[in-house]
Amino acid sequence: MKNKLCLITGGGSGIGRATAIKFAENKVDTIIVGRREDALAETKNLANDNSKYINCIKADISNEKGINKLYDEIDEKFDNYVNILVNNAGSSSQIRSVAHIPKEQWDQVVNINLNSVYLICQKFMKNMIKNKNGTIITISSMAALKPGLLGGAPYGAAKAGVTNLMGAINSEFSNDGIRATSIMPGEVDTPILNNRAKIPNKNERDTMMQPEDLAEIVFLTSNLNNRTNIETVVVNATYKRDVSEDLNAAKNKIK
């Protein structure tokens, strides 16, 4: 992983935090991005002796202006270009049903889970293409394959879109040395679960995949020889829990 510079969105918690720590453990210069400086600082502190490899940048990547500002700041501070991009930032709606979700919740979920990924890929791919080397890894979701109330209508639609976007990048730019991977996990014990109508309890969360499990997959994918690309990864918890109460709660939450 020499001469690598990794950018991770949503690095202040969950999968993004675990991934940043994993890359730092492997001595990879890593930039974590998020809206909360305190959360980013906590990620850096949790890396302990490897914290020197983690760089924190407070940024709003929900719009093109924020992404352009982030790009300019990285370009100014670092000699290397971002050659590993991990699109991890995401959000879900409180109302999951397509029949009841307000447009503002729909727009917010689609914007952060799909539109911002398109914008940040477009911006940072230019240097990857120029240098004939780049890896883009996007945390999609099992909701892309199995839409329903557990993830919610806008979340599933956005994740299906972003999975297709990674395929489009591979189709167009693989011969330019660009690799794009879509990782589609089932339930992972992260703060996004707190947006559900029925918030999973500790026992339920203990059966789920943990952020560090996904971090292992992200690192493995990025660390493969450049001649090899894992285009899609579908990963689930070994234990299949009963989610009927979760689905019922989501169905009944209409405001």
Predicted region positions:
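Residue(s) in the substrate-gating loop at a strand-loop-helix junction
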Residues: 141
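Active-site-adjacent segment of SDR/Rossmann-fold oxidoreductases
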Residues: 146, 168-178
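C-terminal helical subdomain
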Residues: 182, 202-248
